Regions:
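N-terminal capping/lid subdomain adjacent to the active-site entrance of alpha/beta enzymes
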Residues: 1-165, 172-179, 183-187, 300-320
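Catalytic core of soluble alpha/beta enzymes
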Residues: 142, 147-283, 297-309
Length: 320
């Protein structure tokens, strides 16, 4: 039996990017039950990609009973709905066989992953204070994408002088802004910028110098989308809600490596149930941004554990 329902998890603080703010995560939870075993998974439908919670639930409920992971890849397009079911099927298989998902997927035992902790878009002074509070982290990911970005990133560096930095423009720049800011960001020790231009403007990146590595987020979805990014991007951000689950995320990671692209593994604002499979993909990634539940006022039972610099693999009591 396959079920799907919406659940809402409030955040402690608003999360702001160049496109707006969020105060909660409204996720779709899929459950697959067979032969006395139950697996579950989570997806976060994203309006930026034309997804809604209601449409995702309807699509999941329309799936045939007994669907396999292989059949699922053909039955549903990549996205949050398929992610929820794909991860539920992995969890179901692990529980049915009494073996962990990493073993079923042919992976090595997972280790803690160093992650970037995200600083929400705010005033320069507020971002300086947030950076100072998080100066003990290994990596900070700074949300940008407005005309006033230089004072913000300067303030972040003042607040956290030694931390590694990456920035995310969330489609908010033009080629001229990237070209103007890149030398200053490099001076401040920024390692990489995510999605500086809008999805669909990728070709412009092939026409300019990229002294600061550029990561595709909104422009990178599944493995099939990656060859078209060559010559435009240097890094791809793989999120299970974009790839449509763990199955395709592992394929996309392998394809990125084959193409010579660096890999970042990211997430939406979601719970520990979304992080559990993502940690498996993040093994050996160049960057990981898996702090989705870190500021949740409420999370799943048996949540993933964070320390100052890492996310730890999930307990089987949660998933996998």
């Amino acid at each position: 039996m396959i079920t799907a329902q919406a659940e809402t998890f409030p955040r402690r603080n608003p999360f702001t990017i160049s496109r707006g703010s969020k105060t909660e995560a409204r996720v779709v939870t899929a459950t697959v039950s067979r032969d006395g075993h139950r697996g579950w998974g989570e997806g976060l439908p994203y309006p930026r990609y034309g997804e809604t919670v209601e449409a995702a639930i309807a699509a999941i409920r329309a799936l045939p009973e007994g669907i396999t992971r292989a059949a699922l890849q053909e039955a549903m397009a990549p996205g949050a709905a398929r992610n929820a079911v794909d991860c539920a099927l992995w969890d179901l298989e692990a529980k049915s066989l009494g073996r962990p998902v990493w073993e079923l997927a042919g992976l090595l035992p997972p280790k803690p992953v160093e992650i970037a902790f995200t600083l929400s878009l705010d005033t320069a002074e507020a971002m300086r204070a947030a950076a100072a509070r998080n100066a003990h982290r290994a990596v900070l990911k700074v949300k940008l994408g407005t005309p006033a970005d230089m004072p913000r990133i300067e303030a972040v560096r003042q607040g956290a002088p030694k931390v590694r930095l990456i920035v995310d423009a969330n489609e908010g720049w033009t080629p001229e802004v990237y070209t103007d800011l890149a030398p200053h960001l490099i001076r401040l020790g920024v390692e990489m910028v995510e999605q500086p231009l809008p999805q669909g403007a990728d070709d412009m990146l092939a026409e300019i110098a990229r002294p600061l590595p550029v990561c595709a987020d909104e422009s990178a979805h599944d493995a099939a989308s990656l060859p078209g990014l060559l010559g435009k991007y240097d890094v791809v951000n793989l999120k299970l809600d974009k790839t449509g689950g763990l199955t395709e995320a592992l394929r996309a990671k392998a394809e990125a490596r084959r193409l010579g692209l660096k890999v970042m593994v990211g997430c939406m604002i979601s719970t520990s149930l979304s992080m559990a499979p993502a940690v498996l993909v993040a093994q050996g990634a160049d960057w990981s941004d898996l702090d989705g539940p870190a500021d949740m006022a409420q999370d799943r039972e048996h949540p993933v554990v964070y320390d100052d610099r890492h996310i730890h693999p999930a307990t089987p009591l949660l998933w996998g």
